[in-house]
Amino acid sequence: MTTISRYTVFGNPVAHSKSPQIHQQFALQEGVDIEYGRICADIGGFAQAVSIFFETGGCGANVTVPFKQEAFALADEYSERASAAGAVNTLILLENGKLRGDNTDGIGLSNDITQVKNIAIECKTILLLGAGGAVRGVIPVLKEHRPARIVIANRTHAKAEELARLFGIEAVPMADLNGGFDIIINGTSGSLSGQLPAVSPEIFRNCRLAYDMVYGDAAQAFLNFAQSNGAAEVSDGLGMLVGQAAASYSLWRGFTPDIRPVIEYMKAL
């Protein structure tokens, strides 16, 4: 009897997550059966929930808001990009029973921009809005693409300054932003409640791409704001979601899915 490999995504809330549908599409490409669920861990109960999942046969897990930094603390070892980010979105069970933490958010974002949308990051000026775990996780990979400049802005400027020092990028107060950006990436949590970041509409003049890390309806307020104020192209984070999921799947199973048909499949749902 063949044992079906079990995976899950931890978050709170997590009922909205599209990860199960995405990973089932990857499994169809590989020609295997997997089980992929959702676990809403209690705040303060993440470590216990992870322990129970792996002790009862779990093979790998994704981690979303608000547990990515807790997952980093929980892992026994890390990839270089997870260490740089200080946040983990992928837990891999090793043969020795230890957990390896990785962060595939940056790969998902950069692949969506450069491969799916065919927009180069190299030599571009990038603005990151927000300074939470989502933004922190993508900075190391964005830097690998050698942009001309990365600027970070956050509602609480001190948090932006902290990340700027950590990663060797620039921090600018939101109120002082005035344009000159090729790519603007919104990683604030405000999109989840329909709130726009407190930035001037002028920042979108001559912007090649405005990108929101969230996907679906939650991204529309920011994308409409960007497009109506001059952004040449706008995108939600569906491609990033599928891309980071594909990288996680590859780490667990050694099979690299084709993300393009899965992005189209998810758009059609």
Curated annotation (Swiss-Prot):
Active site location: 68 (proton acceptor)
Annotated protein name in UniProt: Shikimate dehydrogenase (NADP(+))
GO biological process, one term: aromatic amino acid family biosynthetic process
Known catalytic reactions: shikimate + NADP(+) = 3-dehydroshikimate + NADPH + H(+)
Record's GO cellular component terms: cytosol
One MF annotation (Gene Ontology) recorded for this entry: shikimate 3-dehydrogenase (NADP+) activity
Alphabetical keyword list: Amino-acid biosynthesis, Aromatic amino acid biosynthesis, NADP, Oxidoreductase
Domain of life of the source: Bacteria
PANTHER family: BIFUNCTIONAL 3-DEHYDROQUINATE DEHYDRATASE_SHIKIMATE DEHYDROGENASE, CHLOROPLASTIC, SHIKIMATE DEHYDROGENASE
Keyword Chloroplast in annotation: no
Binding-site list for shikimate: 17-19, 64, 89, 105, 215
Quaternary structure and partners: Homodimer.
EC code(s) of this entry: 1.1.1.25
Lineage, opening ranks: Bacteria, Pseudomonadati, Pseudomonadota, Betaproteobacteria, Neisseriales
Similarity remark: Belongs to the shikimate dehydrogenase family.
Cysteine disulfide partners in this protein: none
Pathway: Metabolic intermediate biosynthesis; chorismate biosynthesis; chorismate from D-erythrose 4-phosphate and phosphoenolpyruvate: step 4/7
Function: Involved in the biosynthesis of the chorismate, which leads to the biosynthesis of aromatic amino acids. Catalyzes the reversible NADPH linked reduction of 3-dehydroshikimate (DHSA) to yield shikimate (SA).
Sites where the protein binds NADP(+): 80, 130-134, 154-159, 213, 237
InterPro entries referenced in this protein's UniProt entry, alphabetically: Aminoacid_DH-like_N_sf (IPR046346), NAD(P)-bd_dom_sf (IPR036291), SDH_C (IPR041121), Shikimate_DH (IPR011342), Shikimate_DH-bd_N (IPR013708), Shikimate_DH_fam (IPR022893), Shikm_DH/Glu-tRNA_Rdtase (IPR006151)
